Amino acid sequence: GESYDCEIAVERVLEGVQGLINKSQGFNIDKILFCIGNDILHIDNVYGQTTKGTHQDTDGKWWEHYEIALMLYVKCVEMLRYIAPVDVIHSMSNHDYQSGFHLAHTLKSWFRKADDVRFDISVAHRKYYVYGENFIGLEHGDGAKMDNLPLLMAQEQPEMWAKTKYRYFYLHHIHHKVKHKWLDAKDYIGVTVEYMRSPSSADSWHSRKGF
């Protein structure tokens, strides 16, 4: 299979962040939403298992993963805050439910004196964010069914829904990319629900399944 380790993972993330920064040049960027979580640690205990006990292929030790992920997040936030103030939102994930939560809080502590970095790292499974007329929902993708997300969005945050025109829900649970479109009863307000692809290579399970 494809060669992949922590060093390659870090390189891909930093390359992706720098690529987005490069593409944003020429625009008046006044706010950046940085989404973290989504199984970055991949495992949730010292035995190389997920929160529910499923063994995973990993490179290195559990504590190395934590240290590497923390410093990667710090580097990303530092890169982004040079451009504009950063809002960090953490998505609770099924592989590293507890350790990912701890990692997010450690990152918040790192930037505790930074007035240009804000955090939403609660245990809530779905997080919501408004920028101008844009309403953004975030979830790992292992919770509510995809078909239910648009109505959940309206029900859970009616005020945010009412004051926005453009609505998006981003999920991260699968490797391949899927996009659906929902319209309200009058067919004029759209909600786009999209799965974002992982920058990681497929492990043995995903490789066998063809992801």
Write out the residue ranges for each language-model feature.
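Short N-terminal secondary-structure initiator segments
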Residues: 1-5, 171-174
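Core catalytic region of metal-dependent phosphoesterases/phosphodiesterases
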Residues: 2-117
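Conserved beta-sheet core of the metallophosphoesterase superfamily
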Residues: 107-118, 123, 132-137, 142-211
